[in-house]
Amino acid sequence: MAKHTLVAVGGSGQSAAIAFLRLATLSGMPPEELPNIYVIDADVKDRQGADAKPSLYSSLKVLFTQLVQGVPETNKPRLELIFPYSHQQSHEVM
């Protein structure tokens, strides 16, 4: 069966992806059936300091990691952060 894909663009897309993962959890969706999630955002930054609020991407990453814990690598869905501009070449893959 083909793996589904969820593309989360910007902060609103990340909020929607978090809501989807919560709904999938509440509805009992097996973690192997979660879609691959691609986050496209030019503004994602690592926040520093004690007063820094967690970013949406950080929250999404934590939730996703918890949900797919224990899933074999061959069946594990992907979470990938993509920067849309050529000067931001690096991206993160989980």
Feature names for model-found ranges:
Residues 1-94:
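Segments that form or flank anion-binding pockets
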